[in-house]
Structure formats: structure tokens, C-alpha cells
């Protein structure tokens, strides 16, 4: 019995460490498709997010946005300017990856050229992925953190997708 308890404790104690090393959607997408397409990936790290939050509030809109930004740990933006056909292909590859990814992304919203996926852990959204394509441009925005559903609602109120 003692070895089982020890094994259980070892597994439970290492789970947070494994969760910290999960690869986010954008990094996984670039790893799979970066050699085929000229993908440009920009990352806003947790440290940079902290610095952004230290900036003074100078607009009333920041009163609404600041609590949402506090929930975001990092941001990755993947861009590719290419032919319209290649942009559609990248969009379709991102859709397939999200639908069949083992971490379990759920589609939140979708239209012809834009889809939003979320990944939850408990009551929090730990990852929000926006996939878009327009004539010759593919864009993927990946937010990670411990976000509430308010981050999705604010986009709807502001008239965004």
C-alpha cells in the first residue's frame, strides 16, 4: 500500500510541472507547418504582459480592458502573407488541428473566414485561439492564461467576432 501512495503522490506533484510545459496551439501549429509556409510568429511573453499592465491608464476604455488583460499570461500571433489558396489551406490545417488536438479545443464561434476555439480547465479558459484568413493573409492569435468568459463577451459587445 505504501508504494502505491508514494507513486500517487509523485504523479500528483509532477502534474503542475507537466502543465507548465504544455505546448500552446500556435507553437504546435508553427512546428507542424513552419517548413511549408513562411510563417511569422510574434510572442508577447508573460514578463512583457506584466510591463504592459504597469503602464498608466489614460482612457476610460482601459478600465474595461485592464481586468481582461490581467487574465492573459501570454500572446502569440502567427502571420503569413501568401496566395489566397495558400491562406485558405493554412486556415483549414489550423481548423483540423484544433478539432483533433488531444488537449481538447472547443469551437466557440465560426463564420466563413474566422473561427474562435477555447480550451478550458475547470471554470477558466486557459487558451483562446482565433484563426482568420482573408485574401492572401492567414493569421492565428493565441492567448494563454486563466481567463473568464468575460474575455469572450467583451468581443461580442464591441462588435467583433
Where do the protein language model's features map onto the residues?
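Bacterial Sec-dependent N-terminal signal peptides
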Residues: 1-25
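A recognition module on extended beta-rich or small alphabeta surfaces enriched in W/G with H and D/E
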Residues: 149, 153-161
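Early exported N-terminus immediately downstream of N-terminal targeting peptides
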Residues: 21-83
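Mid-length scaffold segments of soluble, non-membrane domains
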Residues: 68-112
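Short, solvent-exposed polar/charged micro-motifs at secondary-structure junctions
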Residues: 51-54, 113-118
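Short, solvent-exposed secondary-structure boundary motifs
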Residues: 57-58, 105-110, 120
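A short, solvent-exposed beta-edge/loop patch
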Residues: 117-148
Amino acid at each position: 500500500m505504501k508504494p502505491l501512495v508514494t507513486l500517487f503522490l509523485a504523479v500528483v506533484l509532477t502534474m503542475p510541472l507537466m502543465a507548465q510545459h504544455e505546448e500552446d496551439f500556435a507553437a504546435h501549429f508553427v512546428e507542424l507547418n513552419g517548413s511549408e509556409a513562411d510563417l511569422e510568429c510574434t510572442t508577447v511573453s508573460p514578463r512583457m504582459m506584466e510591463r504592459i499592465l504597469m503602464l498608466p491608464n489614460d482612457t476610460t476604455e482601459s478600465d474595461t480592458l485592464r481586468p481582461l488583460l490581467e487574465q492573459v499570461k501570454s500572446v502569440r500571433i502567427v502571420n503569413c502573407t501568401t496566395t489566397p489558396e495558400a491562406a485558405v489551406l493554412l486556415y483549414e490545417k489550423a481548423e483540423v488541428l484544433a478539432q483533433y488536438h488531444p488537449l481538447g479545443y472547443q469551437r466557440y464561434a465560426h463564420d466563413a473566414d474566422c473561427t474562435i476555439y477555447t480550451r478550458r480547465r475547470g471554470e477558466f479558459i486557459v487558451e483562446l485561439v482565433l484563426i482568420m484568413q482573408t485574401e492572401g493573409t492567414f493569421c492565428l492569435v493565441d492567448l494563454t492564461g486563466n481567463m473568464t468568459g468575460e474575455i469572450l463577451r467583451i468581443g461580442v459587445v464591441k462588435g467583433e467576432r
